[in-house]
Amino acid sequence: MKLTDYVVEFLQKKGIRDFFGYQGTMIAHLVDSIEKNPHVRSHSSYHEQGAAFAACGYAQAKGACGCAYATSGPGAANLLSGVADAYFDSLPVIFITGQLNTYEYSGIAGLRQQGFQEIDMVSMAKPVTKYAIQVRDPKNIVRELNLAWQIANTKARFLSTCL
């Protein structure tokens, strides 16, 4: 099973049936996994911000956890207005962003980026989330998804997860 198949199946088993997002190279595997799962629906927006607000509206209207996704870099940054909306309205929403291949991260002080659209999304999301993480080791996905789900669905709820 692909890691993204696991992510979609995990969220589907938790009750998420609708995913809102905007396609991009670094999130393509997740989108493929959403599309091939017969128990969920993908809703493509014209902009990542629209996907974020759609997930917020879904969570508010349904009283259930919403989910939005975007690719890395500017795509992920475009989610932030919706992320803040979910945070301030205490809405249960999980945001998933694409990331670089792990070998592409620079980690070099003074070097802006090495990989395609490299951006520190976790630092950008932390002020308006209850939890923001970048999962670099596939072995950690089970633990991080369970923690993400638990935090997103607690009384003071909201979560952003960067995968």
PLM segments and residue spans:
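N-terminal alpha/beta PP-like core and its mobile active-site loop of ThDP/TPP-dependent enzymes
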Residues: 1-163
